[in-house]
Every structure is written in structure tokens, then in C-alpha cells.
Amino acid sequence: MHYDFKKVEQDIQGKWNFYTDAKQAQCYVLEMFPYPSGNIHMGHLRNYTIGDVIARYKRACGINVFHPIGWDAFGLPAENAALSYNINPHTWTESNIDNMRCQLKSIGLSYDWDKELATCDPSYYKHEQAFFLDFLKCGLAYRKESLVNWDPVDQTVLANEQVIDGRGWRSGAVVEKRKLFQWFLKITDFAEELLNDLQILDQWPEKVKLMQEKWIGKSQGVVIDFEILGINKTLQVFTTCPHTLFGAAFIAVSFDHPILQYVNDSKVIQLINDFDRKNLISDVSSTIEKFGIDSGLVVKHPLLNVNLPVYIVNFVLMDYATGAIFGCPAHDQRDFEFAKKYSLPVKQVVFPEVDVNLDKEAYVGSGIMKHSDFLDGMTVDEAKKAIVAKLTFLGVCKEITYYRMHDWGISRQRYWGCPIPIIYCKKCGTVPVDKKDLPVTLPKDVDFTKYGNPLDNHPTWKYVKCPSCGMDAERETDTFDTFFESSWYFAAFCGTSNGINKDVCNMLLPVNYYVGGVEHAVLHLLYSRFFCRALTKCGYFNIKEPFSNLITQGMVCHSTYSDEQGNYLFPEEAKKMMENGQHVTVGRAEKMSKSKKNVVNLEYIIDKYGADTARLFILSDTPPERDIEWLDDGIEGASRYLSKLWRVIISYDKFNLNFNKENIIGDDVKYRRSVHKILSGITNDLDFCRLNCAVAKFRELSNIISEMIRTSVNCYVVSEAIYILIRVIEPFIPHIAEKLWENIGGKGMLWNQVWPKADSELLVERNVTIVVQVNGKFVKALTVANDIDDDQLKSMALEIAKNRIGGNVVKDIYVIPKRVINIVAVKPS
């Protein structure tokens, strides 16, 4: 009677095989593939279990599901491990993959392991090297010298997306600006398309689409030329609010603006050099204080006989528009705060119908123009058109559209990445490697003790003959940004060793269900959308969007614990200290992280409770998109449920599905109706990915079955309910479900059995309860046949309410079908 989960799970996992021919697949389910760090964690458990439930359910519905797995295997941690442990990144990565593969299999995930891939395998990255060469031909890849984000700790270039408030996204180091030759992909060629097509992604979370819309950052405005006094130069200023030009109080430029070369005040130059770039504001929601330095430069207002000071500020960035704006404090909150801090004038030029207090905040609404010369009396929209026309006539203005998004810099000065297939020849210049010579592979005899790029420091690897002229030449020693690999892997699963299969991709893509964290909303998801368009342009397939239904699961959180000195404690350490009477501070639940030690070892949980228990807990109570808090009581409760489920079903010795439903009467019908209503609800929940709701319903079904057994309900009704329960729990807790299926005599594997269909007759209520009211006040609840007609219902209601009506006259009777009947009675006239 005891449920031996270790024996059951090992037995069942050995019997599963989920091979699927991609050419025959009808539904593509994919979770964001893991980086092989060495161990899976609770976040992985949630991510992959959500996807597994969807895949298993769709199979049960008779759909041929494609559910592959792979490894996002390039990346900096492997190089760090090489340096720390004197181990080659290849060896470290392969060992981690082996370990994590075993861990994923232990969870019971229904992957087609025959489709497994790793991005560090030359058989994988040779195709992306070919993509790059085709991008080059199509004008989607180019090389230029550019001011780049240099991470001095990781010793590599970072994309704009990887710089958060002036610091490297991984190292946290203050990012420096350097000029280097870099390779870029022209994602901006598709900026408008990437923006507009967000509208067709109706199964993506709105917050993700808003994040991408913000990152693409389309701004339609004008560039106005301001004359810089004293140096015979012009400063181009971008604005989306030209109508506020008469309220301008200052010019603000980036700390990287070329105009700064004309600053000649040594004190100002020193202040610029001393500025800490971690205080750059790259997001409007940033809490960093606004800061500026008066450059000493002055520009002339293009329409007024006034001069404006030029400030160097931390809230204007050179990588957006022209890197310069004019500040109108009265009508922009950011400018308002800056003006108040530096005692700059606040001149109101837009006036609403009701007076506003500009002592507290800027006014950013509509209104009528005043103090604006020829714009006075116009609306904001009229003023925008008029001032643009005037400035254009004067030759100092042009309309323009800018995007916050820039081309994707893909060069990385790292070893553990895909080599860029380019050769540099003094005679021939930049020469692409011939496709027949791909892949360009990484050398394994690399010295990681030196700083900088290991490939550049390699004694022989980079030295080659030019494929065009045969003279001595050198390889490109940069490697691709690792997001290059993850931007097309979903298509790689649809391919063969010869590359992407165009027909299969066109048939199977976009991915029907894509599951992963919202932290990838901009980088990975946006790059994947770009890759679809770029590969389509190059003729690889004809796909616009990579993922049709995006499910962004919430984080797994746990309380933090700390001792009297404020040092973080692991949960097991905190528990022992509290048992010994020592003081432990319990903090709020936060995302599990090694740094805060609020982690739970997944291998320990699976060893102690089993994979099904871990799966059940991680799917219970909380919708997939919301954060879930790990609770020891919760995992214990899940374990108790499985033990009870096993005990109840194994002990039932009257299992028999050969029944005639016509012979089922009385309470047996009531129980069948409850069972089929729950089945219908679970089916509906799974159709809309309400996994926690489905869990609640099958636990309710378990309780009903226990009640039926206790009250000796017809064995056929109980047997049907047990069969339905076993089938509907399989996507969630597949090991115990498969074993119970065996024990009731099921033929074949349960995962391959059809999903049960609720009896439609049982879903229709034969009786309904209707509230009888007189003048809106309750009289009685009346149970009647579902198909009763209104006249009969009114007669019954009048009979029931006759005492309440008394001597009054019935003026009218209102019926809300199947809910309420209200009798309106008034005093006789």
C-alpha cells in the first residue's frame, strides 16, 4: 500500500520514448533552453514543467507534438571556470550537460531526446557561420569602427541592451566607452516591421510587447539647428515637442557628445573626466538623481534674440537621436526637475482651461499657446505644424523619425563562442571564409591565464592563408555574441545535419507554445524576431514571427534568512539555528539566488519526495505567470496528496468500466454529473493554460472519489471517475499516473491514451434555483425544471408570494431567466 516513488519513477522513466518526426508534427512546444551551468534549479523546474504539461495534454488530445530540448552552451562562465579550475571550456561544458541531462530526465519531462543539440557543437554553429556570410551578402551584416560599451572586468564589448544604468549586465562593472572595429547586424532595417507586428502577437503578454515597443523606441519629431556662439558650429537638437521651443531654457547634451571637444574650461573638462558613468540614466524609471555640468558653451535661439546655456547631463545619451535636446522645464517633468535643481527659468507656453501650479510639477497636457510669438492662440497640434513650417522655411529644421534601438553589435572578445568566419588580408582586405570551409572551429590548446582575447593571443590559430590571393592573412579573432546562437535554435530543431529544413520550418513554425522568463523580453525575444525576418530575406524559410503563444512564467521565491551580523543563511542553516534558540531574521520572499542563499536544492527535493511531488507543488496554487513562494508545508502537502491518491486507488478492488449508463440512477447520477463537470473544467483550464486551476479541480475530484468509495456508490461510476482522474493527472504528475494506469489494467502507455470527453448531457443542469422577490425583496428560493416556461413560473411565484403581496395589486412581473423573478405590487388606487 506504501507509495515507493523512487521505484515507480525509475521504472516509468525507463519505459518512455517521445520520439516525434518533425515532418509529421502538428504542435511545437518549446521551453527556453538552459545554459549548462552544472545543475538545474527551481526556476528550471517551473519553466520546463509548465511546458511539459502543455506537451502532454496536447498529445492526449490526439495532436502530434514536437517537444525538443537543447543547450545554450557558449558563454562566459565556461571561460571563468577554465581560469578558476584549469579546465578546458569544452570539457567543463560537456560535463555539465551530462549532469543536467540526467537531472532533467529525473523530472519526467517528455522530451524527444533524439533532437538534442548543443550550440557549442561545430555541427550547430557551422550553420550560423553560413547565416552570417549570407547576411553579409544581403547587406544585413557590416563592420565599422564604433564607440562601444567596454566591460573592463569581462574584457569584452557589450550590446546596448546589456548595459544597465551604466554597468555591465553580468559583471556589474562600470562600462567604458572605446572605439573598436566591430561587426553589426542591421536589425534597424526591420525596426518599423518589428514594431508594427507586435500587434499580431495577440497571445503574447502585454507587458512583453510594451517592453519591446519601448526598446524599439520610435520617436517622430524634428531636428533643429542651433548656432553655437563663438566657434562657428551648429548643434543639432532632436525634439518631439517643437511647439514648446519658445519655452526653452537650456540645451542638454550627452557626456559623449562631439561638441565637448570645444569646451576649453579646464575645470569643466576635469568635471567631465571625473563623472562616474554608473550615474548615467538609461531608463525613465531610474531613481538616479539628475545631474548636469554647465559646459560654458552657448547657443542662439533660432527664433528669439536670446542665448541658451549648454549643459552636459546624465539623462541624455549619445546613442539616441542626436544626443542633444532643448529643455522646456514648464512642459517636461525631467526638464522641470533639472531646472529647479540648477535655478533655471520656467516659462509656461501651453495654457489649459484651468490654471496649473508650476511650482510643483510640469504641465504636459494640451491647451492654447501663449508667450509664443506667432503661435499665440493656437492649439498644441496647430502650433506643432506652424513652427515646423516656419523653421523649415528658415532652413534650420527637418522632420525625422528616430529609433532608440540601434544595430546589434555582435563582436565579442571572448574564446568560448562561435568564431566569426572572416579573414583579413593586407592585399584583399576583408575576405569571407568560403562556405565549403565551414565550420571555422575553436582551438583547444588555449591559455586562459592571460588577460584579453584568448584567440587573439593564440600563437598559431589566427594565422592563415588568404583564400583569394594565397598570401599570409589573419582570422577574425572575435566571436559572436552568444545571443546569436539562441536567436535561431528553434529553427535548428526543425532541420537536419545539412541545416535548416525550409519545408519543415514553413510548416511547423512559429512555435505554438514558448515558455520562459520575462527577463528575456528584449534581448532574446527581439533578436529571435529579427532572425526570422533576416533568414526569410536570405531565403532560408518564409517565417515572420518565431513564437505565436508566449508564456512567461513567474519566479520561484523563498524567504531570506540572516544572522545577527546580517550575513545570509541557507534555509537549513536558519532552521538549525532557530531550533537551538539562536536569533535569525526572516526577510521577505525574494527570487531564489545563490548570493542571498535562499535556495532549495532540487536534487535533494527529488531524492526526498520524488519528481511528481516537486512538479505538483510547483504547479499548484499560483498561475504560471505569477511568482510562486516556496513553502516547506506546501511540498509536504503535495507529498501527502500523492500518498493518499495511491492508497485510495490501489485499495479499490471493484474497478470495472463495462457499464451501461442507462442503469445509473439517483445519487450515482449526481456523482457522475460532478465528475464530468470537473473533467470539463480541467479541459477548459488546460486549453487556456490555467494550470493551477486544473490542479485544484483534480484534487477536488480525488476527494469526490474518496467520498463515493465511502458511500458505496455504484462501482461502475467510481471506476469511471478513477479512470478520468488517472488520465487528467498524467500531464502534471506523470509517473504515479502511469503506474496507476498499469495497476487498473490499462493497455499501452498512459501518455498515449486519448483525453476523456465530458458527457454533454451531464453538463446540462436539469433543475435551476430561482429567487422569488416582491418589490425587490427576497421571498423564497424556488427549485424548478431547467426548461420551465415563463407563464408556469409566474403562476408558481404568485402562489408562493401571495401572503407577501397581500391586498396590493400586481402591476408587473419581471423574469431574469434562470436567476430571479420579481413581482411588482402596488397599493390599489
From Swiss-Prot:
It is found in: Cytoplasm. A motif ('HIGH' region) lies at residues 34-44. GO terms for molecular function: aminoacyl-tRNA deacylase activity; ATP binding; leucine-tRNA ligase activity. The keyword Disulfide bond does not apply. Its main location: cytoplasm. GO terms for cellular component: cytosol. Transmembrane segments: none annotated. PROSITE patterns: AA_TRNA_LIGASE_I. The keyword Kinase does not apply. Keywords: Aminoacyl-tRNA synthetase, ATP-binding, Cytoplasm, Ligase, Nucleotide-binding, Protein biosynthesis. SUPFAM superfamilies: Anticodon-binding domain of a subclass of class I aminoacyl-tRNA synthetases, Nucleotidylyl transferase, ValRS/IleRS/LeuRS editing domain. It comes from the Bacteria. InterPro entries: aa-tRNA-synth_I_CS (IPR001412), aa-tRNA-synth_Ia (IPR002300), Leu-tRNA-ligase (IPR002302), Leu_tRNA-synth_edit (IPR025709), M/V/L/I-tRNA-synth_anticd-bd (IPR013155), Methionyl/Leucyl_tRNA_Synth (IPR015413), Rossmann-like_a/b/a_fold (IPR014729), tRNAsynth_Ia_anticodon-bd (IPR009080). Its EC number is 6.1.1.4. A motif ('KMSKS' region) lies at residues 591-595. It is an enzyme of class 6 (ligase). It catalyses: tRNA(Leu) + L-leucine + ATP = L-leucyl-tRNA(Leu) + AMP + diphosphate. ATP binds at K594. GO terms for biological process: leucyl-tRNA aminoacylation. Pfam families: Anticodon_1, tRNA-synt_1, tRNA-synt_1_2, tRNA-synt_1g. PANTHER family: LEUCINE--TRNA LIGASE, MITOCHONDRIAL, LEUCYL-TRNA SYNTHETASE. NCBIfam families: leuS_bact. This is Leucine--tRNA ligase. The gene is leuS.
